[in-house]
Amino acid sequence: LLDLMVEAGFYMVFLGLETPLAHSLEEAGKVQNLKTNVVESVRKIQSRGIEVTGGFIIGFDSDPLDIADHQIRFIQELAVPTAMVGLLTALPGTRLYDRLVREGRLLNTPSGNNTHDLDMNFIPRQPMERLIQSYRKLLEQIYKPKAYFRRCLEFLNRLPEKVRHSDTFRSGTFSLRNVAILLRSFFKQTFSWYGFSYLSYILRAFIRHPDKIEQIVSFAVQGHHLLKLTRKILYTDSSPLFQTVPHVQGRIKYDTV
């Protein structure tokens, strides 16, 4: 199947990897993730030349207080450059939503955004402030420049020698636009706040994988957006991380974890 996907032109897949913890997967009903070694499965997909983008969640009732540390190790081991991490949201029509209604823990109808609101629509088992701080720590660590570029390098290391997807930097479609992208990335990112990590990544990637220029540059440009967005979420005064959750005050009784 993977070979056929490559032949058909697939170069990326999104997987709901969720969490490395078995009890949290069982709670979520994600039993398919328990039937295989997820790390090896992801590596197998990557070895065919397909990038894996992963979705990860924290906020399950069975999540331990150190859930952020578990997720950080998991994401780095998977070598998924783009990790979409969100707080658990209870959606109408799901078993989770119905259970939370019965337990009196539902707070509101979700907006559908579980990655930027920094809020939850139900009362979690552990203190909400603690959970949001864990989420903040998780984002902060996986999108540190060094950690992000390490995942990119490891992913490039896992690619086959010859990737079927054409590299426009080395093919007949090479153009001045490609040169402009490369030069803009180099000058903009070299003199950015993470310039050292960027240069280290670019140099090592070009030396090890001179045949994968397009992917190398794409990850660099993508990284600029992800690192900038993460800093904005974490360190801007207007960020929801710096706002209280008034509608929750007085309603939360935390269970011992």
Please describe what each predicted stretch is.
Residues 114-257:
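Auxiliary Fe-S-binding modules of radical SAM enzymes
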